[in-house]
Amino acid sequence: MRQRILRLSIVLISVLSALALFGCGSASAPDGTSFVLNRDGSVTQTIIGTNDDMIGRNDLSAFIEQQVEAYASGRDEPSVELNSCSIEGNRISIELQYASIDDYADFNHVPAYDGDVEEALTKGFLFGSRFLTDSGLEYSGYTIPVEYPEMRVLVLQEPMTVSIPEKAVLYSDNMKKNDDGS
């Protein structure tokens, strides 16, 4: 049964932040910061925050555009794009589009990875956590690299809602799945 479950899915989610939230639905109207891994490998990030400094939308948008332009300099194609920036009261909402997860990681200066387990290990990511299935089965993270080196894995370290294009069969025990099971 265990091998069948794991063979049916190539997706393993390992979010290393103890506060991370997980979802497989749409992130079009998030309540907090969200990360959407799209089918084409691009990433959509929505950042929700508070405007304690009472910065204006134009100033905030100009600052983000400046960061995007600085990141784009020296690159052949644009890889980060500001989709939207809004301020309502003291609530800030920013949506950024990244060409790839590598652009997301580089732009935000955070570790992030999408690929197979074997390559994740060569990049220094470890799988020491416990992993759970929807049915409540537990797996040691230490057995995953040995038994399933070609399994797909998504590694993030930030507390946020995560949405993926496929159903996750395993997820780390420091995550919370949405009430609807996603």
Locate each region found by the language model.
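Bacterial N-terminal signal peptides that target proteins for export
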Residues: 1-12
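Mature, soluble, non-transmembrane domains
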Residues: 85-182
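C-terminal motif of bacterial Sec signal peptides marking the signal peptidase cleavage site
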Residues: 20-23
